[in-house]
Amino acid sequence: GISSLLHSLRDAGVKLAIASNKYQDGAEKLVRHFFPELDFVMVLGQREGQPIKPDPAIVNQIMQAAHCTDRQKVVYVGDSDVDMQTGANAEVRTIGVTWGFRTREELEGCSPSAVVDTPEQLLKAILG
């Protein structure tokens, strides 16, 4: 599942972060509830005075916190057209997942690097 995927990514040295359009408090509560044992570089949600996705500001803030300047090393994973647009606007690689809000066809319409159907496929798409 997702927890196993995140642990595998962490163990492979991947820095993890969350960019959400949920309100900041809600995003943090969800992460603490479902992934209390994982350290994320940053968990960002909707905040007063900050633009929301698909504005790339949220990705730029996370990259800065992760001390990452190479956009080719960043993968933005999401389940919606807004997520795919956010990654494209931030000029990073995007991967759509089909277990969320949008269909494969809708995600593919946004021209992501890949669209995957399982956490195992996502792990392979990220790590190669």
Residue ranges and their predicted role:
Residues 26-29, 86, 106, 124-125:
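Phosphate- and divalent-cation-binding pockets in alpha/beta enzyme and binding domains
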Residues 1, 22, 54, 79, ...:
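Short beta->alpha linker loops
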Residues 53-84:
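Conserved Lys-Pro-Asp/Glu-containing loop-to-beta segment of HAD-superfamily phosphomonoesterases
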Residues 11-12, 35-39, 67-69:
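Short helix-capping segments at alpha-helix termini
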